[in-house]
A protein has these predicted regions:
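Extracytoplasmic "Venus flytrap"
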Residues: 34-58, 80-87, 109-110, 180-189, ...
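Sec/Tat signal peptide C-region and signal peptidase I cleavage site
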Residues: 23-30
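Extracytoplasmic ligand/sensor domains, especially the bilobed periplasmic-binding protein
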Residues: 102-207, 257-284
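Extracellular/periplasmic periplasmic-binding protein-like sensory domains
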Residues: 150-153, 249-327, 338, 393-394, ...
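Solvent-exposed, acidic/polar segments of extracytosolic/periplasmic ligand-binding ectodomains
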Residues: 34, 353-422
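Bacterial N-terminal signal peptides
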Residues: 12-23
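Beta-alpha junction/loop-to-helix N-cap segments that form part of ligand/metal-binding clefts
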Residues: 35, 48-55, 68-140, 211-218, ...
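Signal peptide-proximal N-terminal region
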Residues: 31, 55-77, 169, 199-202
């Protein structure tokens, strides 16, 4: 009898130890951070935007952690510099998934840096949220990809459509167009839309060329474009090319009715300060500016926080262009995690596909290929710029929204005259 009692006591002791170990394991896991991995352009041609996006993501992390994290666990960002170089991306994401074993992945900044990460996400069956990628999923059709870009379900056309709408509303309507694009993924996708829209609207393309990344001098290109005397000049370019093309256009006195369209980088505060009045007359895309028509709940508080931190880390002091969307991208991810109470990739993807999200850049829902259900591409024009001062660029009156109508704050000034007008 005593032997039996002793046996039960030993079994009970073992059970208590096992339960204790189990509880300790659960507690230890609860203390482990949820890791979100990504590459980001911290050096190279996209670094001005990439570093501002990183600050926005760190603000989101700090905000979430101050409220207890996600699923009761702190959030940790695991990131590497992709150097604005697509060739670095596959290795970065392979390391994040296979070595770092992060819980979730999101993209770095821009189409050229998202596209090479897609095969890694797909082969590992991972949820993947892209930041400012134009039509990245149009070839893959991957059901776990979602795009933080207001280009809607038909992004290739939606991106350039507002430029055409603004130009075609003019009297007389433009008849000819010059198209210049960088030889890279984003400009390629944008150019396809431009060609289609030109054909649909009976506009003759009189110049259609690409240029290699790193082109040092755009003056010969501007001269070749001017020789065709186009009514419209659409440029699809990344920041170094945008800066080079605008410099050549102003120095050469390019004359056309409408110039711009798809020039990435002109939205950066540093570029605005660099060119000042030379931006006058350029018609370009944007995604958000603090116009009265676009002050969504929470965004001004975010910008106040961002702008207070920006000087210390040397990033874009205004933060209008990319930071709100970098923050909103993680808002979507975080809300999905909390709603599903899970890190399961399938459950998260199903939830994001089937639910709307309230973010600082407005209400968002996702449709086919993970694109926004509705496009919201802004067409703006720089007007009345008198100097290169930062304070001047805080006034949205010099950057009126021309389209879409529900956000419109001004009307176009034409023709473009090498930056001398506006």
């Amino acid at each position: 009898m005593h032997r039996k009692t002793g046996g039960w006591r030993r079994l009970l002791a073992v059970a208590v130890v096992c339960v204790g170990c189990s509880l300790m394991s659960v507690a230890a896991r609860a203390a482990e951070p949820i890791t979100i991995g990504f590459g980001m352009a911290l050096t190279g041609g996209l670094a001005a935007a990439g570093k501002s996006a990183l600050l926005a993501m760190q603000i989101w992390r700090d905000t979430v952690n101050a409220k207890g994290g996600l699923l009761g666990r702190p959030v940790k960002l695991v990131f590497y510099d992709d150097q604005s170089n697509p060739a670095t991306v596959p290795e970065i994401y392979t390391k994040l998934v296979d070595v770092d074993k992060v819980d979730l992945i999101v993209s770095g900044y821009g189409t050229n840096l998202i596209a090479p990460a897609m095969p890694i996400a797909i082969s590992h069956d991972r949820l993947f949220l892209g930041l400012f990628g134009l039509a990245v999923n149009s070839e893959f059709h991957y059901p776990k990809y979602f795009s933080m870009l207001p280009a809607g379900p038909d992004p290739k056309h939606a991106f350039s459509e507002p430029f055409f709408k603004v130009a075609l509303a003019a009297d007389p309507k433009p008849k000819t167009l010059a198209l210049l694009a960088e030889d890279a993924e984003f400009p390629k996708n944008a150019s396809e839309g431009v060609r289609d829209l030109a054909k649909q609207n009976g506009i003759k393309i009189v110049y259609d060329r690409t240029y290699p990344p790193g082109t040092p001098d755009f003056t010969p290109i501007v001269h070749a474009i001017q020789a065709t005397n186009p009514d419209m000049v659409f440029v699809a370019s990344y920041p170094p090319g945008s800066v080079g093309m605008l410099r050549a256009a102003t120095e050469s006195g390019l004359k056309t009715r409408f110039f711009g369209g798809g020039m990435v980088g002109l939205q950066y505060t540093s570029v605005k300060e660099q060119f000042g009045p030379k931006l006058n007359g350029v018609v370009d895309y944007d995604w958000w500016i603090p116009a009265p028509t676009m002050q969504f709940p929470g965004i001004l508080d975010f910008l106040k926080n961002y702008q207070a931190k920006a000087p210390a880390v040397g990033v874009d002091p205004l933060g209008w262009y990319l930071p709100p969307f970098a923050y909103a991208n993680l808002q979507v991810l975080g809300d999905a995690v909390e709603a599903t109470k899970s890190l399961d990739q399938d459950k998260l993807a199903d939830y994001i596909h089937s639910h709307p999200f309230k973010t600082i850049v407005g209400d968002i829902s996702f449709g086919s290929d993970g694109e926004w259900s509705k496009a919201r591409v802004l067409e703006i024009q720089w007007q009345g710029i008198k100097s290169n001062s930062l304070d001047q660029f805080k006034d949205t009156k010099i950057e009126p929204i021309l389209d879409p109508p529900e956000y419109k704050t001004g009307t176009v000034i034409a023709p473009y005259n090498g930056g001398a007008g506006g």
